[in-house]
Amino acid sequence: MQLSEENKREIKFHDELHGNDKVRFENRFYKALANMFSDFDSQIEQNCKNKRILDFGCGIGNNLEKVLKFSPKEITGVDISKVSLEKAKRIIGDDKSKNINFIHDNCEKLSFVSGSFEVVYGSGILHHLKYDLALKEISRVLTNNGKIIFVEPLGTNPVINFYRRLTPKSRSIDEHPFLENDFSYFRAHFKNVKLKYYGFLTLIFFFFYKDPKNSLIFNFLSNLDQKLFKYKFFQKFAWSVLITGAKN
């Protein structure tokens, strides 16, 4: 497996991150993106039944067990961190893990043959990679008209960027959340690319609700967010984005 210096740093970071059971402080904020993850799951469920699926940068398998319930024909999880893959197997358990192909590989230079998968999805992985290399590989391993479904952080909110500067040890030094111009990489390889933004007011007021599923406050804020995100000005204040498309 060929590795760049950036790849080696990412391996070290994620091996250390997942080599213990500590919960990251930042995890408490992710409830502000509950509607995004719900939409992400819905997109996968609508597209994966009886399909060959790739979890791109599967990490510790946060999505794999869930996607198994959506009846894919075959599901593969690939990650550059052996520590993460082993932890994923432990978390998911032996009975379910035997239904998943776990592959240790470099997402910027995959060993799969072209056209291996009908759907490729990922959560918070692309901003750890070189966009041009990763998206070219995703396109290569997809069948014609194969689908992509990704959620990624944005690097356009000044308050979030300030927090990132204050907490450099919480992320790898090579991370680069998406900027507006970065979406051109998607459009170079995929058609019908759609972006849906999340996490503005739901993040600002996250102290005012506990469980987003049962919160009228969260529902109000998330609906208001979607109205605001129709205007380009407010999109830069989003925390994250859902990206869908199909192979050219």
Residue ranges of model-derived segments:
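Conserved class I S-adenosyl-L-methionine
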Residues: M1-C48, I149-R171
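Class I SAM-dependent methyltransferase SAM/SAH-binding core
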Residues: L54, I60-K109
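Class I S-adenosylmethionine-dependent transferase superfamily signal
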Residues: V67, I138, F186
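A short glycine-rich, Lys/Arg-flanked "PGG" loop and its adjoining helix->strand segment in the class I
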Residues: L133-N144
